[in-house]
Amino acid sequence: RIADYRLSPAEDKVLFRLDGKPLYRRSAYSSYVVYDTELGEAAPLHESDSLRYAVFSPDGERVAFVLRNNIYVKELATGRETAVTTDGVPNHIINGMPDWVYEEEWGLEDALRWSPDGEKLAFLRFDESGVRDYSLDLYGPDGSTPEDDVTAPRYPRRFTYKYPMAGEANSAVSLHVYDLASGRTTHVDVGPERDQYLPFFGWTPAGALCFYRINRLQNHLEVFVDDLKGTRKMIYEERSDKYIDNIGMGTVTFLSDGD
């Protein structure tokens, strides 16, 4: 059953996400299918049914997707796949997808952005190794049997995930840019502070990278634009003696000339 779909920019392809296994409030493990509207043909994006996210490149010729906490790029014409990251490990390193905090509290559904020219990928990397585990007992069907099946599990199952209590360590989050032509990944300088949030990032029309930085107390917000050539400029700053509301955060719009 189709859960969601995305059209390519030229609307000649459709990326279908099929029903999968829920993870958190907004995320799931799913299968994806690419449908070519001109040929009338459909093909799986990947053989796995555990993809976390997939998105067309700006020209519609590639798809970036996240599988097992790593990012891949697939050329649709040839089927060739390139690994953007290789260090992803469950409950340790997440690439291209938010951890629980960023999904639940900041509303991020993904952590991966194509550049306007389709030649670069910006992504967040979450190091959860310092975050303590939290476990819940889950009752009811686990998805392996129909809900009305008498053989469905009657005992609770244990679900364990990384959950930082108040005052405990959050994930260490870093921002990176992958260049498809060179295959090189660049670490973006977001400042020396470890205990902070990067709740929004994206590209300007001119190809510079914009990102928000806010401290853990959430009362000091800074917005930067980095041209990825050595120049970073703060374009907005806000302070509060209480806290800064995150409603509407990330709804920045750049003019077409990028200025």
Put a short name on every predicted segment.
Residues 1-259:
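Beta-propeller folds
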